[in-house]
């Protein structure tokens, strides 16, 4: 189960990481913030 446990600011930061980092994408929950 995936849940968004991040603030909006953290979510935006993670979204940028998802867009630029395949490693981040692989290690993170795909549904985090609905961005990965």
From Swiss-Prot:
PROSITE patterns, sorted: SHKT
Subcellular location, record wording: Secreted; Nematocyst
Disulphide connectivity of cysteines: 2-36, 11-29, 18-33
Coiled coil: none
Domain ShKT, residue spans: 2-36
Keywords per UniProt: Disulfide bond, Nematocyst, Secreted, Toxin
Note, other: Negative results: does not inhibit human voltage-gated potassium channels Kv1.1/KCNA1, Kv1.2/KCNA2, Kv1.3/KCNA3, Kv1.4/KCNA4, Kv1.5/KCNA5, Kv1.6/KCNA6, mouse KCa1.1/KCNMA1/BK, human KCa3.1/KCNN4/IK/SK4, and human voltage-gated sodium channels Nav1.4/SCN4A and Nav1.5/SCN5A.
Job description of the protein: Probable toxin with unknown function. Does not inhibit all channels tested. Is not cytotoxic on macrophage.
Stated family: Belongs to the sea anemone type 1 potassium channel toxin family. Type 1a subfamily.
UniProt name for this protein: Kappa-isophellitoxin-Tst1a
Provenance organism: Telmatactis stephensoni (Sea anemone)
């Amino acid at each position: 189960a995936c849940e968004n446990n991040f603030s909006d600011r953290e979510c935006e930061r993670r979204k940028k990481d998802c867009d630029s980092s395949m490693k981040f994408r692989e290690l993170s929950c795909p549904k985090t913030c609905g961005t990965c």
